């Protein structure tokens, strides 16, 4: 029987300078995507997370050279841009500890980034960045308050297809579909039965979800979830119907985070989860599932979420993994194909919540710094 990950007596209210009203939300969810801007020959990565009062943040990191072909050293990443969205007290406000899922499409010639999150009314919202503009719309899909979110895609020519996954109020794993040219979301498949105390293979309420596609131009979909018994299982779809199978992880801490990705030209699938000792584990598929192994000896924060994104070049593969460190900072781990291993230690991604100054004319702004309130105002 799985059990909850131990917390090592960590008190989030005593974390230190990294835990404060303007800082990163303790146990925030993450989403990460790689973005290739071919018209401008630039390459960057976006990380999405949530801060203390519930605002969502978009952090953009870019290679110094801005090359789409030449990788730099790992610490050559530098903060390029940061913005806040889904502010508290607005119609776009996100629920606290909202799950996050993101995807990028290229069928318009320029990269278009889509971010999905859950509102305070437990409905899925979608933020789209396209050609320098941003929209935020409610999809009208009501989810379980503890639902996770996952998204994947495939495309051929000028048409891209999205598949969005979530958990319903009954606990079933549901799918919504978008053919991007059509522009309208439609209901897709129901992948599982409801949560059941009598079925060990039914989804755990609040299970993490992660989906990938093993093909670029057609659906060869795989999705991962945790069962009521605590095992991690796999959904598989190859264009006809969904099936469910085991991957060899029979017990993991309840609600362990799941993050999956493909490497080696989609020949290998990698799934990551956190064990009971707050270490990240990896399970690889290359025609068959291999045993679970820890990727390093470094602990993550209890209750952390995971996000992974890949940067792929000719002859190069990199996986960037993001999680929360023990002092409530964003940490990054990097795997490279050249080394065939993860780096020695995770590095810290700088997160500084924006400070706004609102003062009357003639007053010194240095002594009138403002801070956000729970309803989104600044006082």
Curated annotation (Swiss-Prot):
**What keywords were assigned to this record?**
Virulence
Gene3D superfamilies per UniProt: Fucose-specific lectin
Which SUPFAM superfamilies did the record assign?
Fucose-specific lectin
Q: Which residues bind beta-L-fucose 3?
A: 282
Organism per entry? Arthrobotrys oligospora (strain ATCC 24927 / CBS 115.81 / DSM 1491) (Nematode-trapping fungus)
Residues reported to bind beta-L-fucose 2: 163, 242
Deletion: any effect? Delays trap formation and weakens nematocidal activity. Does not affect mycelial growth, conidia production, conidial germination rates and adaption to environmental stresses.
Give the residue spans that cross the bilayer: none
InterPro entries, per this entry?
Answer: Fungal_lectin
Residues reported to bind beta-L-fucose 1: 126, 185
Q: What is this protein called?
A: Fucose-specific lectin g276
- Which residues make up the binding site for alpha-L-fucose 2? 222, 234, 289
Family to which this protein belongs:
Belongs to the fungal fucose-specific lectin family.
Pfam families in UniProt:
Fungal_lectin
**Job description of the protein:** Lectin that specifically binds to L-fucose. Is associated with the morphogenesis of the fungus, and plays a role in the formation of the constricting rings involved in nematode-trapping.
Q: Where does this protein hold alpha-L-fucose 1?
A: 126, 185
């Amino acid at each position: 029987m799985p059990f909850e990950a131990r917390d090592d007596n960590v008190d989030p209210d005593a974390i230190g300078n990294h835990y404060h009203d303007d800082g990163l939300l303790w146990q925030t969810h993450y989403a990460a995507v790689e973005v290739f801007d071919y018209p401008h020959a630039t390459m960057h990565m976006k990380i999405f997370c949530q801060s203390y009062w519930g605002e969502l943040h978009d952090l953009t990191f870019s290679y110094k050279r801005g090359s789409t072909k030449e990788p730099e050293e790992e610490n050559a990443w530098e903060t390029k841009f940061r913005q806040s969205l889904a502010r508290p007290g607005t119609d776009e406000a996100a629920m606290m500890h909202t799950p996050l899922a993101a995807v990028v499409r290229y069928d318009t010639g320029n990269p278009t980034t889509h971010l999905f999150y859950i509102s305070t009314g437990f409905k899925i919202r979608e933020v789209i960045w396209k050609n320098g503009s941003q929209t935020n719309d409610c999809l009208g899909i009501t989810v379980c308050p503890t639902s996770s979110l996952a998204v994947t895609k495939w495309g051929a020519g000028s048409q891209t297809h999205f598949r969005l996954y979530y958990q319903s109020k009954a606990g079933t794993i549901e799918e919504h579909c978008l053919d991007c040219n059509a522009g309208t979301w439609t209901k897709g498949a129901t992948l599982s039965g409801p949560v059941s105390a009598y079925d060990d293979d039914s989804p755990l309420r609040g299970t993490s979800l992660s989906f990938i596609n093993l093909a670029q131009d057609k659906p060869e979909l795989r999705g991962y979830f945790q069962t009521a018994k605590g095992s991690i299982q796999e959904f598989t779809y190859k264009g006809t119907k969904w099936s469910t199978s085991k991957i060899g992880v029979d017990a993991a801490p309840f609600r362990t985070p799941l993050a999956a990705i493909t490497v080696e030209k989609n020949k290998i699938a990698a799934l990551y989860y956190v064990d009971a000792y707050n270490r990240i584990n990896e399970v690889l598929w290359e025609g068959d599932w291999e045993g679970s192994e820890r990727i390093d000896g470094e602990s993550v924060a209890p209750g952390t979420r995971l996000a992974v994104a890949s940067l792929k070049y000719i002859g190069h593969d990199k996986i960037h993994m993001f999680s929360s460190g023990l002092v409530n900072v964003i940490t990054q781990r990097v795997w490279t194909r050249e080394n065939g291993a993860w780096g020695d230690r995770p590095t810290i991604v700088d997160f500084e919540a924006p400070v706004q100054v609102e003062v009357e004319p003639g007053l010194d702004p240095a002594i009138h710094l403002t801070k956000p309130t729970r309803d989104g105002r600044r006082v």
